[in-house]
Amino acid sequence: SFSEVRNIQGDIPEMEDRPINVERADACEIHPADSGREEDCHQLELESESVNLIVTSPPYWQLRDYGIDDQLGQEDDVEKYIENLINALNRWKDFLHPKGSIFFNLGDKYHNKSVVGIPGMFAQRVQEDGWTIRNHIIWAKKNGIPDPADDRLVPRHEHIFHLVQNDDYYYDLFGYSQVYGNGSNPGDVWHMSHDRNTGDHLAPFPQELVLRAATLACPPKVCTKCGEPYSRKVERPPKNLNRDRPQAARAIKKFEDSDLNEEHLEAIRAVGISDAGKAKVIQGGAENNDSKVQELAEEAKEVLGGYFREFTFPLPKTVGWSGCDCNVDTVPGMVFDPFAGSGTTLNTAYSLGYRAWGTDLDRSNFEPKLNHYSD
């Protein structure tokens, strides 16, 4: 939910002037305001490397005609469609921060009674073009549009490609796992329903897709000078146990009633489960630790008994956010949707507190009261 994501994202900076900007433009023919290019394409007010996250879904191949020459999705053959997708990505690369991510929702199609295989073709080409597919996520749909076919199963999944430019990208798996995985890595299959009341748009993806992508890959704040994203600092405080577990609650009580201190708990972590039984024989835990550490661990074990094991794996906890050394103000991360469609990405990002920017050739699906348009 919005509240869960807002809570885990921490202190997103407040901005007095934070509109949702939407420009009517061809997503395949755009470039940043500071690019200096003189070619025939649409110059956005966005600057180079100012976008932290792109969440988008391009037009399906040969599905909807907007009545515009050379529009994406109306190519005669699928190979040209894939080529145009790759060219569009290379346009967007100019806007994307080096540590930024793209979550690219791509559907498949039946043609001449056969699945075309568009996601597979795209995956091969995008890697050949230098992008890294960090995850190939499956959107498993809990609901969908009725299908009249009586000789095959109804398609109930789409593909989401998480694309990055290099191996140094912003990623908050800890925050994501707190919301969507109960503290553990929840995997690459996203079970999501289509949103209701999405108007006349043919293929809106759900708000939850944007929530998930933003939680994973959009920093809550970035430096106004250098653009560096702030990253979560996670530690494991020795007493940070799951107190809902009776054993953990009892362990904390025994510790607090004793003369032990946190040095003893740190010693327990250092020694770990290798200090007992067969694990001690196999791993030689006691022999690999400083004598002082081993002494503290023995003292703790004598007081806590079997409950000392509870302190072996304390839970991780956010202790702050780290950024650059510019010592200037920060602003919320920037989310961009080149195929803004019904505005799901932009409105969701805005509701979370992020800055939001989009382009589209067809603005008929937007809610004018929520957005600022320019042609």
Regions found by a protein language model. Name each.
Residues 374-375:
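Conserved phosphoryl-transfer catalytic core
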Residues 371:
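Residue-level detection of the helix-turn-helix DNA-binding "recognition helix"
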Residues 1-368:
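Core catalytic lobe of class I
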